[in-house]
Amino acid sequence: MKALSKLKAEEGIWMTDVPEPEVGHNDLLIKIRKTAICGTDVHIYNWDEWSQKTIPVPMVVGHEYVGEVVGIGQEVKGFKIGDRVSGEGHITCGHCRNCRGGRTHLCRNTVGVGVNRPGCFAEYLVIPAFNAFKIPDNISDDLASIFDPFGNAVHTALSFDLVGEDVLVSGAGPIGIMAAAVAKHVGARNVVITDVNEYRLSLARKMGVTRAVDVSKENLNDVMAELGMTEGFDVGLEMSGAPPAFRSMLDTMNHGGRIAMLGIPPSDMSIDWNKVIFKGLFIKGIYGREMFETWYKMAALIQSGLDLTPIITHHFGIDDFQKGFDAMRSGQSGKVILSWD
């Protein structure tokens, strides 16, 4: 079958021919319809320091997808041939304390699809049936293919009660923009998103944020004054991993503010911990999605009217995958969809 693989320990992704995966007793075989390119896939393409330490070569990559069930392991219940599914990209162990306690998103032995085991940039994917999620009929293939990153956004945004709150989102990548849209949809008062990429800030405006702020040109305190905010942000969603953005968030949070961090900062990021202590801030780390509460909320948010379609900016056939990666690497895109049909 055709598959996009990290074939060599250098920059790039290659179209390869690999054997079709075998279906285990508890697995589903999924025929891939559409996939989306994640920032993680760009890291793997660029072969940065993280990728060199993490990715075995060769490896079929990718973890954002929608497809159709075409094979079912003999122990699997609850699925049938023809079901349209996406799936949780974190394969969990099932036997650690968190897994056994129902907190599977906190599994200490997580294996990543397209990172530690073969991924979805292929004609077929095998995953445990436990990880599959049936897509409702009224949700399109395009939207279903981005459920994985949308789940990051939902998990982060819904970490705290947002009704009536003023929310700061730092980082206008696709996940940050979707988190801002979720915050607005569920009843936040002001949702302010910051970045230095004007293309992506304009995408955020299309998604309905209160203010999209280019912090290289505007002062966040001036924006707060313009919005009539006198006490700071109630909730911060840190999606950038950029130390200056996080420090600015700490500066502008209200006392007792709550911060959810999805962005991965450099390991040596320094902050003024006095601001955390004396403001009484609460900081929560976010990894992946809650299994599977986040997935049900994702479907419900879309079914209740949340419009994510502006975040999908590019479509390519799989033979034009290089154009898709070029678009993602340029920073002048939202989500990029690759079609396998």
UniProtKB/Swiss-Prot annotation:
SMART domains: PKS_ER. Its EC number is 1.1.1.103. Disulfide bonds: none annotated. Zn(2+) 1 binds at residues 38, 63-64. It is an enzyme of class 1 (oxidoreductase). SUPFAM superfamilies: GroES-like (SSF50129), NAD(P)-binding Rossmann-fold domains (SSF51735). Zn(2+) 2 binds at residues 93, 96, 99, 107. GO terms for cellular component: cytoplasm. It comes from the Bacteria. It catalyses: L-threonine + NAD(+) = (2S)-2-amino-3-oxobutanoate + NADH + H(+). GO terms for molecular function: L-threonine 3-dehydrogenase activity; zinc ion binding. Binds 2 Zn(2+) ions per subunit. Pathway: Amino-acid degradation; L-threonine degradation via oxydo-reductase pathway; glycine from L-threonine: step 1/2. NAD(+) binds at residues 175, 195, 200, 262-264, 286-287. The active site is at 40 (charge relay system), 43 (charge relay system). This is L-threonine 3-dehydrogenase. The gene is tdh.
